[in-house]
Amino acid sequence: MRFNAGVSLVALAAASGITNAPAHGEEDRIEEIQVTATKRMASTQDIPVAVSALTGAALDDLDVDVFVDYLQQLPGVNAGGSGPGQSTIYIRGLASTTPNLTTAGVAGLAPNVALYLDEQPLAQPGRNLDVYAADLERVEVLAGPQGTLFGASSQAGTIRLITNKPRLNETEAITNFGIAFTKGGEMSTKVEGIINLPVTEKLAVRAVAYVDDQGGYIDNVAGTRSARESARFRPAGTMRANGVPVSAQRAGFQGTADLSDVTFLDADNSAIAEDDFNDTQYTGFRFGALYEFNADWRLTVTHARQSIESDGVFFIDPEIDDDDDLSVSRFEDDRLEDDFSNTSWTVEGRLGALDVVYSGAFTDRETDQRVDYTDYLFVGQYLPYYICDSSVSYPGEATPSGTCQPPNMFVNSTTDTTVQTHELRFNTPAENRLRLTAGGFYSDLQLDERNDYTYPGSIVADVFGSPGFSPNFPFTTGFRSDDGPFPAGVIFRNDVRRTDEQFGVFGEATFDVVPDLIAVTFGARYYDIEVDFEGSANASFCNSFQADANAFGTDISDIYNGDGQVTFRGSCDTSLHQTFDTSDTVQSIVDAIGVSEAQAGQIINAINAPDVAETSGVIFKANISITPTEDTLFYATFSEGFRPGLLNRPGGALGPDGFVVPFELETDEVINYEIGWKLDLFEGQVRFNGNAFFVDVQNLQTTIFDPSIVNLFFSANAADAEIYGVEGDFIYAPAGVEGLTFAGAFSILDTEITDVLVPTDDVIEGSELAFAPSFSANLRARYEWDAGRDMTAYIQPQIVHTGSQRSDIIEINAAEIDDWTTFGFAAGVRRDAWSVDLFLENITDTRGELANNFVFDRERVTVIRPFTAGLRLSYRY
């Protein structure tokens, strides 16, 4: 239950480090938090790493549950996306693109922020798992490249969720109940139960279960829409809402046609219009067992299951004029079911002087999503061909006439992801002058995804004298989820299997040059990653006038099988579907099937397409730290990051200006230069941590949707960029006022695209990166006092500000995300076994913008939850 839309992670982490009711004048009033950010236990103040930590106590204090929701409030960290299970995390402004449904799986970029649950990485293509934050020991946020220790996707940082483990010799039971009321929205409720039981002296178990019903607050309002608004009928020069005009290359095929004789039937959503339609339920459990063989060896096994059921959407249409600015018009039902099961195991022990950790995990994630696709109308040039009479789309020399069916469309999307990971590492003793961490890592991911794009109007449209389209069948050369035919109305199907296999060897050594004063660290990681595609992106273009010919579309299995040959499918005439190989030339292909030299060149390129997208290399890290006193640490760091490459479904497609969609994209190279400080001042009353950094980004990966090139999302190494930044956080616990603390944090970013690597106008040199606000900050105060009868009371006001930012580096898809400021307040009373907390979130009812998706030429703005008041009760047995 999102009771904390205005909570700052850094501020909360600061709050978690405050000792309760310290004596006046006592030193070290600010507690140090122990973390494993360097893969060995150490205090946040003793390691030369930019790390913030939020303890389980702070999570309980502030009723934080949904990880991405409160992560968004950390300066320097943003979470782009459009609702539960559909978000991507960005740190320090290293972002390029807006997450979107059709790039959420097989075609999605690997995240550049790694998400860990205990010892296992959970990063998946397109978007991370949305793990409910139940019974956590702490959350660690590591900013900047962490690739030497944490591997792929740790380019911009790493986020670690550390769960509470079973405890021997301790019996514990906790129940939590919460209720919240959102202005103009539905009520939210949640229930959690936690139990820890020692079974024997060597065996203990721990379990947590939860149900969290989050009420909706966005209205699906009645509206109509017709194919008259299609991009096909839009002339060049039309000014789009983001200020970028329609170029001549993207002008509608019939942008100047006389449509007076065309009947446009409206899509009408009045039957599904509903207030507060974006409700969500998180349900799940986690069960763990710990067995201690002896003083040196232990085994921990954990199994977790979680289900998200979500209706509606979490974005609004700012063009709809209503009282609360929380409305959108959707013409088909939107829903999401996102389920995962996760089993992990960790063996910890000692071999002589070495600490040994082996961890493994297996995750199975299944999603079933239905998405209203009607907005595609605004960019889909070929849409009228499928839902209008052919006399409208292809009238010849005549004036267009006939009927266009309602343009309501939807996508049925299913995914099945399985991942296994294994890591073995060794640590030398922490007290040694020379300390070493070294190990190996392996992971194997398989993702099966099928997207059925359904155009109901295609079933009844008069296409060249007959109703609808003939049944469509999948390509037969490789992977397919079924043998067909596709369901009625399914015009396109993306049916793809993606596999990612990773292997890595890593090491990091620290040497105390001058003990207790100067230390140097050197780290390296060798990595080898292969990404492979099978399947197809199938179309129905020829099915309007003949039986299915398996024409057009993309036979992915044929292109990426590495056999040195490919079958041409770019014609409805099946006699031209000839197979060519490495012995063919441009001229021989032109002679054989009569295509242009440019098309023949595409075939030659496809023949030589790679079998897999392979990324391998070595990255390095170097660090020097100086500790003049036990309360002062300064450091300088050089670090690098990487992530997997990718194959493109429409690889080889030819666009304007000679641009060819690449078959393969490489890792983007991230080099980070950083100086930082960690200071405990004024006899432990003040803590001030911070850093300044410069990030050099080469070959930045981005996802592009440009219908003038191809009607599929594709990815490319589109640009080079630079990031300058300063970030910091502080805590002030004045000795003169017992129980009073202040905490805050800030982030300053300056990002710029320095070079454009694609010969199109999609990316512009000098523009900013996405999700990179120039300034963000937060401030909170907390006052605790003895309320008598063994009770402690507190109050906590807070303010959070996020600066304006862009949603994408792709100019035609970019929109401005406005800056916003929100206020929150919390108060509570606690006793030994129970606590009561009151929360007020977004007190000013601000429409804070988290994301703005302009991919389909209309702003769709994801906003924070409106003003919400909540109550939480907790009891410990």
PLM region spans:
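Outer membrane beta-barrel strand-and-loop segments of large Gram-negative receptors
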Residues: Y386, S390-E423, F486, Q502, ...
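Structural signature of Gram-negative outer-membrane beta-barrels, strongest in the C-terminal barrel
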Residues: L290-N294, A304, F426-P429, G439-S443, ...
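Transmembrane beta-barrel wall of Gram-negative outer-membrane proteins
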Residues: K183-S310, T417-H422, A430-S443, R497, ...
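Membrane-embedded beta-barrel scaffold of Gram-negative outer-membrane proteins
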Residues: T346-T374, T627-G651, E664-V726, F730-I731, ...
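C-terminal beta-signal and adjacent terminal beta-strands/loops
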Residues: E32, Y453-P456, V460, Q798-I810, ...
